[in-house]
């Protein structure tokens, strides 16, 4: 006997997600089910899926339950598990507000990348404490077709390779993941950002997200880009004691990234719930059969 399962759709700077509320972690969502739900032609469509679970009900999050009531069980569009999604956290927080679980102000969200602090502003913007960036040593190159560029290795809880280019079109169609060297630099894959300057402390980027392809926005990617650009510009807030703020344009909008002197990075941008409904469990079972 089939049942109806609630879902919502939301986006943060057009990085869009299927949202599945499941407070008690009762649903079985294997990778194939997530991929089917995120399919833009045969499913609901999304760059990824936000599985909304109480931290105490999820084995990966129970250790964070004292700090954060809710766990963002994030999945990429192909069904693979991801450590963190910056735009996803903002949309996750907006959903919690939409559902009446939280109000404007501060809250904590558990993720595989740790507990993230979130602030929901009166104007609708959501600010997320993204943690600190790690800058692993070692030279990395990325390439598309015959073009190749040196890249800055930045880790935001997930790996990023940031390449500065003369023209964003040089990245091509980004249907396939850009190549990287050395081949063993990212054993679990990497998110690749291509960046151009737009003005003082203002850049634009395109991104190929591992497991999802090119997306309209990537929050952790925008943070990685801001940090890489600051270092290229000779700015290190830990050394100067002055925050470094960059405006980062993505195809789906604009994010504002601030790196504080203590190393913490804050990302501010919009988050929107656009629809809600139900899907039939029998459909999903048929897809998985």
Curated annotation (Swiss-Prot):
The active site is at residues 85, 218. This is Diaminopimelate epimerase. Pathway: Amino-acid biosynthesis; L-lysine biosynthesis via DAP pathway; DL-2,6-diaminopimelate from LL-2,6-diaminopimelate: step 1/1. GO terms for cellular component: cytosol. Belongs to the diaminopimelate epimerase family. The record marks 160, 209 as: Could be important to modulate the pK values of the two catalytic cysteine residues. It comes from the Bacteria. Keywords: Amino-acid biosynthesis, Cytoplasm, Isomerase, Lysine biosynthesis. Signal peptide: none annotated. Pfam families: DAP_epimerase (PF01678). GO terms for biological process: lysine biosynthetic process via diaminopimelate. GO terms for molecular function: diaminopimelate epimerase activity. Gene3D superfamilies: Diaminopimelate Epimerase, Chain A, domain 1. It is found in: Cytoplasm. Its EC number is 5.1.1.7. It catalyses: (2S,6S)-2,6-diaminopimelate = meso-2,6-diaminopimelate. Homodimer. The keyword Amino-acid biosynthesis applies. Catalyzes the stereoinversion of LL-2,6-diaminopimelate (L,L-DAP) to meso-diaminopimelate (meso-DAP), a precursor of L-lysine and an essential component of the bacterial peptidoglycan. InterPro entries: DAP_epimerase_AS, DAP_epimerase_DapF.
